Amino acid sequence: MDSASHITVSVVIPTRNRPSLVTRAVASALAQTYAAVEVCVVVDGPDDVTISALQQITDGRLQIVRLPQNVGGASARNVGVRNARGRWVAFLDDDDEWLPKKLEKQMMMAVESPYEYPILSSSIIARTPHGEFLWPRKFPSAPLSEYLLARSSWTQGEGVMQTSTLLTKRELLLRVPFQDGLRKHQDWDWLLRSVALPGTGIEFVQEPLAIWNVEEKRATVSTTSDWRYSLEWIRQSRLFVTRRAYSGFVATQLGSQAAEQGSWNAFVPLLKEIICEGEPKPIDFCLYFGMWLLPGRTRRWVRSWANRNQLAVAKQRMTGPTMA
């Protein structure tokens, strides 16, 4: 750890109108066992309440950047990267938290990486209204687009590289910034474009280092945007995804969105998209039809039932058996 402990890591946290959540996120970043940390909170638009809450934190490692108008999460992250003083940048969403050794463990791996531009991620504890789950169930593999976008089972959490787990060099983020104005799929978009750059590779810490607070009832861009927006994004990303990944994304992401919105006129066109533009596997058809035929509440119950013991089993695997 000595070779990495002096290297400054800048933590970029975009936020808007969530003072109680962002102060919790900041506290988890400032509580890292890795000492060489600065925290850059980008307040995305006029927000006096959040500014006031952040100003109560007296730690000199906290930097507050105020934006005069709302620009969205992708652009706010880019502002944070440009203001960062560290050689490395880690991202943290304002409603998530880090475990204390997150940066320490990732930086230990980062300095040993053979890649010029390593992108580090980790397992994550997904905290949902239905319980806690340890994701991902599979660790990253090539091609990355299939790992992220295609599924091989009924349950969620197979391929996950959540934004709050990401750490990489600031230089890479300046060369490949987040796509300004992109409302959805920001992390997938950045990851897929970044790994296309020579010298870039994925490094993964297999233990959970962050908590992803998943609130299914909270309205977000991801839950309110029309499915057509996601279709346009995947079409524009064809150079970065395999045909298998394309089919998987349309089947699960677009199928779920269109079904939730009751857009039955999209059923046949999306099915044609899966078949004609991709290379689907049987699981893609099963998932697609399931999205339309099973109500959202039923699908969530099935996922919860299938995964309910996962976190306990994983914790036992990491800590060893309990002695009677």
Which sequence ranges carry the predicted segments?
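N-proximal low-complexity "stem/linker" segments adjacent to membrane-targeting elements
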Residues: 1-30
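Acidic helix N-cap motif at the loop->helix transition within catalytic regions
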Residues: 23, 47-56, 97, 101
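A conserved acidic beta->alpha catalytic loop
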Residues: 28, 35, 43-52, 69, ...
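Glycine-rich, basic loop-to-helix element that forms the pyrophosphate-binding segment
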Residues: 67-84
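Flexible acidic/His/Gly-enriched loops in nucleotide-sugar-dependent glycosyltransferase catalytic domains
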Residues: 75, 103-172, 223
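Short aromatic/hydrophobic "clamp" motif used to bind/position activated sugar donors
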Residues: 89
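Conserved nucleotide-sugar donor-binding catalytic segment
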Residues: 141-227
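C-terminal subregions of glycosyltransferases and related glycan-biosynthesis enzymes
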Residues: 196-202, 206-324
